[in-house]
Every structure is written in structure tokens, then in C-alpha cells.
UniProtKB/Swiss-Prot annotation:
<comment type="function">
    <text>Possibly the antitoxin component of a type II toxin-antitoxin (TA) system.</text>
</comment>
<dbReference type="InterPro" id="IPR024069">
    <property type="entry name" value="AF2212-like_dom_sf"/>
</dbReference>
<keyword id="KW-1277">Toxin-antitoxin system</keyword>
<comment type="similarity">
    <text>Belongs to the UPF0165 family.</text>
</comment>
<dbReference type="InterPro" id="IPR008203">
    <property type="entry name" value="AF2212-like"/>
</dbReference>
<keyword id="KW-0614">Plasmid</keyword>
<dbReference type="Pfam" id="PF01954">
    <property type="entry name" value="AF2212-like"/>
</dbReference>
<protein>
    <recommendedName>
        <fullName>Putative antitoxin MJECL31</fullName>
    </recommendedName>
</protein>
Length: 65
């Protein structure tokens, strides 16, 4: 299962902004994406098109790393 979540880095710990559906002591891999990337995606001119699934576009972008 893959999921994109938002976190805040505070006191040396990444803290999710919403509850996670993960069992305790589960080992995961985390991809760190800076907010600058989010701002870039939001500012893209393509975003003005109505027929684009932006959730899928965003997920495809993150999966490319």
C-alpha cells in the first residue's frame, strides 16, 4: 500500500497531520518532498485544464523519485 501524507517536522520527529492506518512497529519507507515542489505543482499552467485528474498527476510525480 502506498499513501501520500502530510507531516510536520518538530523536535526531530516527523508527525503526521492526520491519523495513520498502520499497525504498530511497522517498518516503512518515507519519501521527503519539500513544499516547494507542492507550490510548483500548484502553479503549473496545466492545472487550468478541466479534464486532468490532479490527484493522479501528483501521485505519478511523487512515484517518479
Amino acid at each position: 500500500m502506498s499513501e501520500i501524507i502530510e507531516v510536520i517536522y518538530e523536535d526531530g520527529v516527523l508527525k503526521p497531520l492526520k491519523p495513520l492506518k498502520i499497525k504498530g512497529k511497522k517498518r516503512l519507507k518515507i519519501k521527503i518532498v519539500n513544499d516547494d515542489v507542492e507550490e510548483f505543482l500548484k502553479s503549473m499552467i496545466i492545472k487550468k485544464c478541466k479534464d486532468i485528474d490532479y490527484k493522479k498527476l501528483k501521485e505519478a510525480y511523487y512515484e517518479s523519485f
